[in-house]
Amino acid sequence: MKLIFTTILFLTILTTFGQTRTPKDFGFRQIDFLYKTDKVDILIKSKKGDENKKKPLFFFCQGSLPQPLIKYDERGTYDVFPFNPDSLSINYHIVIVGKPYIPLIADTKTLGNNFTFIDSTGQFPKKYIARNLLDYYVDRNIEIIKYLQKQTWISSKQLVVAGHSEGSTIASKIASISPLVTHLIYSGGNPMGRIMSIIQQSRARETDTDSTRFGEEELSYWQDVVTNKTSLDATQGDPYKSTFDFSIPPIQYLEKLKIPVLVCYGTKDWSSPFNDYLRVDLIRKGKSNFTFRPYIGTEHNYFPLTSDNRPNYEIFNWDKVANYWLKWLDQK
């Protein structure tokens, strides 16, 4: 096992559709994009009636797991974004891109655990595994951004790249490479890399020094990752190459940025101490282009914890988080 990020999905009740469902049925425009030889699904969320109105691009990099972007069951559809995009769509065209070789739309009855897509062998598709890599996502997304900014309905005056969880690492590296990016939103990330969240989560499970050496097991796992850092074998979970690449500390991308950066995180998330470290280090270095927004007492997806340290799903904070993003962007 390696670090498990719980995917939070909320159901929106919709009118029953016919047998053939398209992104338009769910309120999205779709663009089929070819990256190298790969067909890429791009979804655009725009304010109704403003589809052709010139606005900046808000490019959202989602977290891990090979999930279809649009998921539905007999009751309705699950939200594509973890937040309600309506407020952001007033000022932006919001874009999200599908995972490689994962269907765009799926009935949840056809999906595996955590709504993941599995093939006939019961595994994630091999073509997905071979592309589920940091640099693949970064390079692909930069090409998509270049393409979108050529469209008549996209303003190039501002380009916001945002990412949550795994997506924060992708977003931060995009911002470090592409001069087109004007603002970065870094949400729920670990500036010291994925492996540090894995170790932190396992350390929290330890109760004594003899029988619960979970952190030590993760450090042994990390040694295996480094030894086999080009391996794409996914029989035991994420390929070593994917874990290695996402464990390169994003702090080295972040601290070089001169554009406005917003860092959001829950203080009960495993990554919280490392975001605090980033903040301390930036203060020490006199960097003034960063804004930090900690959500006190909340976990990875901004849910508060109960007395027994379980997420309280009755209190949904994601819309507050996204509304603050909009407020921050208005000020920057």
Describe the role of every protein-language-model region.
Residues 270-277:
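Conserved alpha/beta-hydrolase "acid-adjacent" motif
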Residues 147-202:
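Primarily recognizes the serine-hydrolase "nucleophile elbow" in alpha/beta-hydrolase
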Residues 114-122, 127, 183-256:
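Accessory cap/linker subdomain of secreted extracellular hydrolases
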Residues 257, 263-265:
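Short beta-strand/loop motif that positions the catalytic acidic residue
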Residues 49-91, 103-108:
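Short, surface-exposed "cap/lid" segments of acyl-processing enzymes
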Residues 20-53:
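N-terminal cap/lid segment of alpha/beta-hydrolase-fold proteins
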Residues 298-302, 306-332:
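Catalytic active-site module of serine/aspartate enzymes centered on a nucleophile-bearing elbow/loop
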Residues 112-152:
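Alpha/beta-hydrolase active-site loop
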